[in-house]
C-alpha cells in the first residue's frame, strides 16, 4: 500500500516494530492526526492494532487498555474512519459480540468503509463467533459478506457462501435459499459451489444419497477446508431426523430408524438416547419400538430464557437485514450513477 505523500519514506509507525516502541508511536499518532490521515494509512493501522493486541492482550492488561482507549477515542469521532473497524474488532476480541454488532449498525460503518476492509472485518467477526461457539452470530457475519459490493470475488466470498449455508443447516436442519436478485455476488458463487448445493439437497433427502455426494465431493471439501462444517453437519444429522419424525409419528420401529440412518440398531439406540431423552423403548412381537413421549411443559424460568434467546436472535436477524439493505442500496446507487 502506498502511503500519503506526507508519510512516504517516513511512516509515523510500523506494525513490525517492537511493541513497546510501536505503542508510544501509535498512541501519539492517533491523538494528533486527522480522520483522513488515518484512512490513508488504513492497512498499517489495522496491522499495528492487531500486533499490539497480540502482544499485550491477556499478558499486559494495562498496556492493552492504553491501546483500546486510544482506538476507542478515535472511534468517537463523528467521521467514520478505519479506527472504527479497529474498535469493533477489539470488542470482538473481548467477546462483546452483541455490542460489536449493534455498534456496527449504529455507526453505519458499512456506508463509509472500503469493501475490502469491511470484508476482512466481517470474516474476523465470524471467526471470533465460531471460536466461542456462537453459531447464530457467525451466520450473520458470513451472510453479510455475501452482500459486500466487490468487482472480484475472492476465496473469502466462497468461504462465506458455504460456511453460511452449512451453519444454517447445522442449526436448523433446513436449507436457506440465497436470493441472487439482491446481490450480484450470489449467482456466480452458486455456480462455483455446486458440490455444497448437492450436499444440502442430499442432506434433506436420505442417508444413501448423502453418502454418495460426500464420496464424490470429499476432495473438494478438503481443498476448501470445509470438512469441519461437513462433519459437524453429519454429527447432528440424526438429531434433525429425530425432530422430523417426532412431528410426524408417535412411535417408530428401531429397525426403521437404524435403516434410515444406515447404522446398526445398537448404535441407533445410543444416538436416540443422546439427542432425545423424552423417548421410551418398548418390545412387542420381538421388535423394538421407539415411542416419542410428550415434551415437558415450559417453566416460567425457561419461558423467560427462551424469550431472551428469541429477542437476541431477532436482533441478529434485524442487524443482518439492515446491513444487507445498506449494502444493496450502495449497489443500486452505483448502478444508477453509472
UniProtKB/Swiss-Prot annotation:
Keyword Nucleus attributed: yes
Location of this chain's protein in the cell: Cytoplasm; Nucleus
PCI domain segment(s): 137-306
Biological process per Gene Ontology, one example term: protein deneddylation
Superkingdom of the organism of origin: Eukaryota
InterPro entries for the chain: CSN3, PCI_dom
GO cellular component: COP9 signalosome; cytosol; nucleus; prospore membrane
Keywords: Cytoplasm, Nucleus, Signalosome
Family assignment from sequence similarity: Belongs to the CSN3 family.
Assembly, per entry: Component of the COP9 signalosome (CSN) complex.
Function statement: Component of the COP9 signalosome (CSN) complex that acts as an regulator of the ubiquitin (Ubl) conjugation pathway by mediating the deneddylation of the cullin subunit of SCF-type E3 ubiquitin-protein ligase complexes.
The protein's name: COP9 signalosome complex subunit 3
Name of the gene encoding the protein in the UniProt record: csn3
